[in-house]
């Protein structure tokens, strides 16, 4: 077929194809965060992120096969290796609720008494809890991503 559907996509509607490539699907990222930077390891911390979706689509975590599989998590990677030493999964957010132009605010309260004193980095990611809380969905950003897929945020000292 010389002038089939694919031909029309690229010749008659290429601007729509380019728009779909740029904005289609889901693109999740935290656009606002409140993170503690100095903590006692006997304390309870509170993290308040706001998540946005830059894409038209939604993350289908409301489907039975993905239900509660992917969750937002915060990590304390070792400052030298950037490997997570502690991972805190936030059970509250439902990623399918993150829709374009509708930012969602969440809260994670966590006891960090098991964290050894030292210097760490706060990091955030979307983990797959069926795969040992490894990164399961990449956050929509190009910079400050570790080799494990965590988005690094800021330094933190635990005393």
Predicted segments, located by residue:
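Long, contiguous interaction/targeting segments characteristic
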Residues: 1-25
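Extracellular/luminal regions of secreted and cell-surface proteins that mediate adhesion/ECM remodeling
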Residues: 18-159
């Amino acid at each position: 077929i010389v002038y089939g559907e694919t031909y029309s996509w690229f010749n008659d509607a290429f601007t729509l194809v380019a728009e779909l490539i740029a904005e289609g699907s889901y693109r999740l990222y935290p656009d606002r965060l409140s993170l503690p930077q100095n903590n006692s390891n006997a304390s309870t911390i509170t993290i308040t992120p706001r998540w946005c979706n830059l894409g038209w689509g939604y993350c289908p975590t409301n489907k039975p096969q993905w239900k509660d599989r992917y969750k937002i998590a915060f990590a304390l990677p070792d400052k030298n290796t950037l490997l997570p030493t502690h991972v805190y999964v936030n059970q509250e957010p439902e990623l399918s609720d993150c829709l374009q132009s509708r930012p969602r605010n969440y809260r994670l309260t966590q006891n960090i008494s098991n964290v050894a004193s030292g210097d760490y980095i706060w990091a955030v990611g979307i983990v797959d809890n069926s795969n040992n809380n490894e990164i399961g969905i990449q956050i929509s950003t190009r910079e400050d991503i570790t080799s494990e897929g965590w988005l690094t945020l800021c330094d933190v000292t635990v005393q």
